[in-house]
Amino acid sequence: MSVCCPGSWIESPEIPAVQFAQQSITHPVAARTVVICGGGGGAAVTEDGGGRPAGVEAVVGKDYVASLLAVTVHAQRLLLLTDVGAVLEHFGTAAATPPAQLSLDDLSAMRFPAGSMAPKIESCRRFVNATDHRAGIGALSEPSALFAGTAGTTIGSHTNKHNAQHSPV
């Protein structure tokens, strides 16, 4: 994936190739401590030929980082909180609906805007594939409801979008 910047294009790797400071994250998580790490737009780092950290021209994708971290720390759930209440099927049309649940098969038949929802969907898909746990996309103001499955969209390996619908967003 490439991202346009004034005067040039730079790469946004789908998954960072190297996981730095993994123990710095997993030990506090194991101790049930809230850890805030990762994020988008930061300095992209990889390993040089000698195994040392080296900066590269790239964009750090926050959704991909969240998915990678969730898999790395063996998270039971991945929640991507955003400014929309749920995934919208048929986004941008009068038929737009927020499915409460989607399966990986459902996702493969759907298309999402490249710069907004697509990275979130792909990150959830990767997490569910790697862990067989559920992921969710929903409003920043409703993390507890998203976790409980009463708001937002839950993505699982075998859930069925026709099982439930939330009220229109």
Where are these regions (language model features)?
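C-terminal catalytic "cap/lid" subdomain
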Residues: 1-169
